[in-house]
Each structure stands twice: as structure tokens, then as C-alpha cells.
């Protein structure tokens, strides 16, 4: 099934699919109805870019969460390249062999031992690198703000 079984990963929850182009507010509104059915273990995530310079937008989303949904968090990217000192989002690219690899957009570093990357996967913030399936899922995530 195109877009479902042709991925190297699966999802198993009520969350809007990571590739869905949807606003933070619409995503939270949609997912909130399922949290009412699962109060013992329910959370929604909003993918956001670096929001350091847009605190009013963060507050707006946080207020919406407070007013409308049981439990939600913001996922942001905060990576660091130890080779050149780049502080931002390390990119996922496809190398010449078709493998997904992490690359510093500033200096091209691909040595995972010389970069710090943190992403939320399966509910936890991890700093180790992931298998190809999970890396594909991370790459396909769209931003909600």
C-alpha cells in the first residue's frame, strides 16, 4: 500500500502520521479526542523548528495545550557539530549507497562520534543514532509551526 507499507518503519498509535501537513493547533485538536479515551497513557507531539527567537509562538502553542488537551509536548531540534561548532539542525541525507546518514550542513561532517544529535523517538529523547527505519521516520517528520 503506497505511503503505508512501503516504509522502513511502522507507527502504532492514534497520532497524525509524521508526514501529514497539518498545523500544530489542528493536530492537537484532532488528537485530543483520542486522549479522552486513553487517559492512562496519552500524549501528543508537535514538531517545531528552533523557536529560540519566537517565544510568543511557543507561548501560544503552550496556552492552546493548557486549554485544550490533556498532555502534549513540543519536539525541537538542537544539534551540535563537534568539528566546526555548528549549533542547529544536523541534516539527514542519502549517501551514494542509498543509506540515510547524518551530515552537518555547515562543514559536511558525517562522523557520528563527532556530533551531538537529539531526537524524540518512541516517547523518549535519544542521543544515540537510530536504525535506518527510524532515521527515515525522523527525516519524514513535517514541522507543525
How does the language model describe each region?
Residues 1-145:
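Long, C-terminal-biased catalytic regions of enzyme "large/alpha" subunits
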Amino acid at each position: 500500500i503506497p505511503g503505508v507499507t512501503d516504509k522502513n518503519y511502522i507507527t502504532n498509535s492514534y497520532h497524525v502520521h509524521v508526514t501529514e501537513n497539518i498545523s500544530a493547533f489542528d493536530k492537537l485538536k484532532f488528537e485530543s479526542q483520542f486522549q479522552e479515551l486513553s487517559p492512562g497513557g496519552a500524549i501528543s507531539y508537535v514538531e517545531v523548528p528552533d523557536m529560540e527567537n519566537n517565544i510568543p509562538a511557543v507561548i501560544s502553542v503552550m496556552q492552546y495545550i493548557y486549554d485544550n488537551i490533556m498532555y502534549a509536548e513540543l519536539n525541537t531540534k538542537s544539534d551540535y557539530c563537534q568539528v566546526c561548532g555548528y549549533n542547529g539542525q544536523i541534516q539527514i541525507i542519502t549517501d551514494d549507497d542509498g543509506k540515510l546518514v547524518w551530515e552537518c550542513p555547515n562543514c559536511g561532517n558525517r562522523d557520528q562520534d563527532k556530533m551531538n544529535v537529539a531526537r524524540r523517538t518512541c516517547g523518549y529523547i535519544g542521543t544515540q543514532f537510530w536504525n535506518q527505519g527510524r532515521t527515515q521516520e525522523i527525516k519524514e517528520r513535517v514541522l507543525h509551526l
